[in-house]
C-alpha cells in the first residue's frame, strides 16, 4: 500500500496561510515550474510548506543554506510528519580541509577530514529511502549539488534477499564485499557483516542500532530477522530485505576494469604533455600518485580520494554533468529553496570556487585533468535537473522574482503581531538619543538590538554604553556558534539588555523580548544596508507587540525608501486583518530553552573545566571522559554538531593533560 504524507499538528492553517497553501498547490498541479512564497518573519512558512507537501504528495527536497538552518528545518518537519520518511542530507565532514596547492610557497596541503559517522548514516538513510518509498522529504544543505555516485549503479547493486530464496552463503558474502561491506566478526558496526556457521548478520549502512540476521538451511534462506545489534533481541521477522551499498561510490568489477584502463590512458597522455613542456617534477609527481591509487583500486576496489576518478568510474565523457542527490529522486519531485535570497547565490558560486582550487592541483601534477569533473553542478545544470521549485524568503532575490513574477504573499502572523513602525532620526546626537531609548526599554524589561557598520564602531559603542552603566554585549564574526547561542540566551534571560553587532541577520536572532532595533548609519548604501538586509533587520523587531525600529540617517536612500514602504504596506495589511477578525497582537511567549537546542552548552563545559585535569584522580578523569563521550554522541545524534565538536576538543585537551 502506498504511504501518504500526513501532518500531525494541533494547529490548522491561520491568517493568510490557507490562501498561500491553495495558490502554491494550484500552481504545482497546473504544472508551474517556479513559484515564490514571500513569507514575512514569523508567519509560519514551514507550516505552509508542510501543508503544500501534504496536498501534492510528491517526494520533496528542502534546501537550506547552512547546516544549522538545515538542522532546524529537519526538526520542525520531523515533528509535522512523524509517520513519513523525513531525512537529513548534509556534508558528513565534522572538519574538512580540501587538498590544495600554493605555488608561491610550494606548499601542498593534503586533504584532511573527519567524517561524522552519524551524518554518514543519515545520508545513506536518505538515499535508500528514495528507492524504497514515495513519502520522502529530504532536508539538505546546498552541498547536495556536489557529485555523488551513479544512482543506477547504487540501485542495481542492492542485495535483495527473501525467505525461501535459493542462495549460497558464500555467494552472499561475495555480493556484500562487492557493495563495500567488510567482514568483521569482532568489531561489528555500520557497513560490516559477521558470519557464524549458517548465520550471517549484516549491519546496514543506513541503520545505527539494528542489524539483519540471515539464517540459511543448506543453500536456501530459511529466515530473516531484524535484531538489536547490541543485545541480540529479535525485533521483527522479515519476508524480504534490501541491503543498500555501504558507499555511494560503488562500481561493478567489470566497470572498474574499464575505468582503470581509461585512467592509465589519461595518465600516459598527461605524462607526455608534461614532459613535452619540460615539467619534469610535475610529471614525476602525477605518475607516482596515480600509480599508487590504481594499485589500491585493483587490490581493494577503492582508494583514498576515489571521488576524483568519478568521471572514469561512471564512464562519463569529459565535461559531462556529475550525478548528485537530485538524480536519486524520481522525475516528478518538488524542491523548496529556503531563504532563497541566500541559497540561490550560493548555488551559483559553488562551481567557480571548486574549479579554481582544482585547476591549480591539475597544473602542478597533483591530480589528473579528469579530477575537474568531480565537481558541484553549475547553476545551469542545477536548473535543468529541477522539476518544480518553490523559493521561500522574506526578501526574495532578483533571480527568483524574474523567474516567477507572480509572488504568493504570506504577511499575516498567527499571533496578530505587526511589522514594526519605523522612525528616521538625524545622525547628529544619535548616541544620546539612543541612550534615552535604551533606558526606556530597560525600564519595561525589554531588550535592544543595535546594528553598526564597522567593527570599530561596534567596539566603541559597546565601551561607551558600559561606561554609562548599561549591561551590553557585542556580537562579532569571531564569536563561535556556541558562544553566540550563549550570548543570545543571556540576552533573553536579562543578564544584559543590549546587543551590539554588525551583521545581525543570521538565524537564531528572532528574540521575542526585543522591542527596539536601532540601525546606525542607515543611509550608507552597501550590502548591510541594502533593501533586503534592511527588511530582514526590521523583521527582528516583529516578535514583540511594542516592536519599533529607529534608523539614524541624514537622508533617505533608495534602499531605505523601499524597505520603509514595504514595511508600511505589510503593516497596513496586518492591521486590517486584525481589525476585521478582532485580534489583539500578543508578544510570542517562547520558553528560553526553545531558542537553542544546546542550552546546556552555556553551562556544562564550565563544570567540566572546573577541576583541571592535572588535579583529578585517575578515576575522576576516566569518569569525566566517559561522561563527555556519551554526551558528545548524544549531541551528534540530536544533530547538534557544534556542541559535539566542542566536546570533542575538550576531550582531546583532557586526554592530553592526563
From Swiss-Prot:
Domain of life the protein comes from: Bacteria
Motif (Beta-hairpin): 92-115
Domain Helicase ATP-binding positions: 26-413
Gene3D superfamilies registered for this protein in UniProt: 6.10.140.240, P-loop containing nucleotide triphosphate hydrolases, UVR domain
Protein's UniProt keywords contain ATP-binding: yes
Compartment(s) of residence: Cytoplasm
A Pfam cross-reference name: UVR
CDD domains for the chain: DEXHc_UvrB, SF2_C_UvrB
Keywords: ATP-binding, Cytoplasm, DNA damage, DNA excision, DNA repair, Excision nuclease, Nucleotide-binding, SOS response
UniProt-annotated binding residues for ATP: 39-46
Gene Ontology molecular function terms on file: ATP binding; ATP hydrolysis activity; DNA binding; excinuclease ABC activity
Comment text on domains: The beta-hairpin motif is involved in DNA binding.
Subunit-level organization: Forms a heterotetramer with UvrA during the search for lesions. Interacts with UvrC in an incision complex.
Descriptive protein name: UvrABC system protein B
Organism: Bacillus thuringiensis subsp. konkukian (strain 97-27)
Amino acid at each position: 500500500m502506498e504511504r501518504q504524507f500526513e501532518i500531525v499538528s494541533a494547529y490548522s492553517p491561520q491568517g493568510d496561510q490557507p490562501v498561500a497553501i491553495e495558490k502554491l498547490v494550484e500552481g504545482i498541479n497546473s504544472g508551474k515550474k517556479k513559484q515564490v512564497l514571500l513569507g514575512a518573519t514569523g508567519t509560519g512558512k514551514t507550516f505552509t510548506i508542510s501543508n503544500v507537501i501534504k496536498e501534492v504528495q510528491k517526494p520533496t527536497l528542502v534546501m537550506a543554506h547552512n547546516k544549522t538552518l538545515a538542522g532546524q528545518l529537519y526538526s520542525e518537519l520531523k515533528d509535522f510528519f512523524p509517520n513519513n520518511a523525513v531525512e537529513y542530507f548534509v556534508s558528513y565532514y565534522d572538519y574538512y580541509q580540501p587538498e590544495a596547492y600554493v605555488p608561491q610557497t610550494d606548499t601542498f596541503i593534503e586533504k584532511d577530514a573527519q567524517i561524522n559517522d552519524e551524518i554518514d548514516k543519515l545520508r545513506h538513510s536518505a538515499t535508500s529511502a528514495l528507492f524504497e518509498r514515495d513519502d520522502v522529504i529530504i532536508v539538505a544543505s546546498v552541498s547536495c549539488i556536489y557529485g555523488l555516485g551513479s544512482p543506477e549503479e547504487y540501485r542495481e547493486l542492492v542485495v535483495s534477499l527473501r525467505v525461501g530464496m535459493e542462495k549460497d552463503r558464500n555467494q552472499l558474502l561475495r555480493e556484500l564485499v562487492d557493495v563495500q561491506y567488510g567482514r568483521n566478526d569482532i568489531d561489528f558496526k555500520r557497513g560490516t557483516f559477521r558470519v557464524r556457521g549458517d548465520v550471517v548478520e549484516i549491519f546496514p549502512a543506513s541503520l545505527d542500532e539494528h542489524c539483519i540476521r540471515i539464517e540459511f538451511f543448506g543453500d536456501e534462506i530459511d529466515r530473516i530477522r531484524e535484531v538489536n545489534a547490541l543485545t541480540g533481541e529479535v525485533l521483527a521477522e522479515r519476508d524480504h530485505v534490501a541491503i543498500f551499498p555501504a558507499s555511494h561510490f560503488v562500481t561493478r568489477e567489470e566497470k572498474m576494469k574499464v575505468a582503470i584502463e581509461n585512467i592509465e590512458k589519461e595518465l600516459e597522455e598527461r605524462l607526455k604533455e608534461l614532459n613535452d613542456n619540460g615539467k619534469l617534477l610535475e610529471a614525476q609527481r602525477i605518475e607516482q600518485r596515480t600509480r599508487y591509487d590504481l594499485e589500491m583500486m585493483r587490490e581493494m576496489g577503492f582508494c583514498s580520494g576515489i571521488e576524483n576518478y568519478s568521471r572514469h568510474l561512471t564512464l562519463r565523457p569529459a565535461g559531462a554533468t556529475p550525478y548528485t542527490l537530485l538524480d536519486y529522486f524520481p522525475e516528478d519531485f518538488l524542491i523548496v529553496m529556503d531563504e532563497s535570497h541566500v541559497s540561490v547565490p550560493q548555488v551559483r558560486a559553488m562551481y567557480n570556487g571548486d574549479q579554481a582550487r582544482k585547476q591549480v592541483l591539475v597544473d602542478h601534477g597533483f591530480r589528473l585533468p579528469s579530477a575537474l569533473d568531480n565537481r558541484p553542478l553549475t547553476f545551469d545544470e542545477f536548473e535543468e535537473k529541477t522539476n518544480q521549485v518553490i523559493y521561500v524568503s522574506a526578501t526574495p532575490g532578483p533571480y527568483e522574482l524574474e523567474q516567477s513574477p507572480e509572488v504568493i504573499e504570506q504577511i499575516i502572523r498567527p499571533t496578530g503581531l505587526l511589522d514594526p513602525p519605523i522612525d528616521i532620526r538625524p545622525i547628529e546626537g544619535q548616541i544620546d538619543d539612543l541612550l534615552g531609548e535604551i533606558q526606556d526599554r530597560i525600564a519595561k524589561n525589554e531588550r535592544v538590538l543595535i546594528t553598526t557598520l564597522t567593527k570599530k564602531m561596534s567596539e566603541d559603542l559597546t565601551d561607551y554604553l558600559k561606561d554609562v552603566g548599561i549591561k551590553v554585549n557585542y556580537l562579532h564574526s569571531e564569536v563561535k556558534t556556541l558562544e553566540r547561542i550563549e550570548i543570545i540566551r543571556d540576552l533573553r534571560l536579562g543578564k544584559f539588555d543590549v546587543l551590539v553587532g554588525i551583521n545581525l541577520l543570521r538565524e537564531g536572532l528572532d528574540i521575542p523580548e526585543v522591542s527596539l532595533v536601532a540601525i546606525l548609519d542607515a543611509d550608507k548604501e552597501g550590502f548591510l544596508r541594502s533593501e533586503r538586509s534592511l527588511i530582514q533587520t526590521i523583521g527582528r523587531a516583529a516578535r514583540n507587540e511594542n516592536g519599533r525600529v529607529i534608523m539614524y540617517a541624514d537622508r533617505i536612500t533608495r534602499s531605505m525608501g523601499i524597505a520603509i514602504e514595504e514595511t508600511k504596506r505589510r503593516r497596513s495589511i496586518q492591521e486590517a486583518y486584525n481589525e476585521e477578525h478582532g485580534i489583539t497582537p500578543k508578544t510570542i511567549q517562547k520558553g528560553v530553552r526553545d531558542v537553542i537546542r544546546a542550552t546546556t552548552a552555556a553551562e556544562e563545559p564550565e563544570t567540566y573545566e572546573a577541576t583541571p585535569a592535572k588535579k583529578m584522580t585517575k578515576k575522576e578523569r576516566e569518569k569525566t571522559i566517559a561522561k563527555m563521550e556519551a554526551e558528545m554522541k548524544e549531541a551528534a545524534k540530536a544533530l547538534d554538531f557544534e556542541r559535539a565538536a566542542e566536546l570533542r576538543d575538550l576531550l582531546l585537551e583532557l586526554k592530553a593533560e592526563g
